[in-house]
Amino acid sequence: MYTNNAYLNNTTMDIKDKSKPLIVTSCGTYHLFTRPKLPTWRPRGRRDFQLLYIASGKAHFHFSQKEEIVTAGHIVLYRPKEPQKYEYYGEDQTEVYWVHFTGNDVTNILRYYGFTKGKHVYYCGKRLEYQNHFKTMIQELQM
């Protein structure tokens, strides 16, 4: 498994910060090759937002106790306090990029770009440009 992660102020704690319109608090990437499974289960969610981009392979998400297989070219958005349950499997060769963010204008920014409340999965296509944006965020937080 390949992993590259970065955290604002070197903390892995999720935070809620309303001091700016949008603050990236952590971001990273995972690429499973041989690890059989990488599960995440946050029954109470987090205090911040999370956006995940499936760059290759697929991921298994659970919304309202129903499994949804999300393939490459899709993004998944979790809002604060939403339960988060998902798994990546090595056999799927999943490559995922993720970012956690907070801020005082996040809801309006998401609405402006078409992210509607109650929907989690959005198609955006497979583009190297998206991966490069995530890599830039990771590098910035690692400085």
Segments predicted by a language model, with ranges:
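Generic protein-terminus/edge-of-domain signal
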Residues: 1-69, 90, 113, 117-120
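Short acidic-glycine-tyrosine-enriched beta hairpin
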Residues: 65-79
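Amphipathic, well-ordered alpha-helical segments in soluble domains
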Residues: 23, 50-53, 102-105, 129-133
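Ligand-binding loop in jelly-roll beta-barrel domains
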Residues: 67, 81-105
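Structural motif
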Residues: 49, 75, 94-96
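Amphipathic alpha-helical segments enriched in hydrophobic/aromatic residues interleaved with Lys/Arg
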Residues: 109-143
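DNA-contacting interfaces and partner/effector-binding or oligomerization modules
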Residues: 71, 107-108
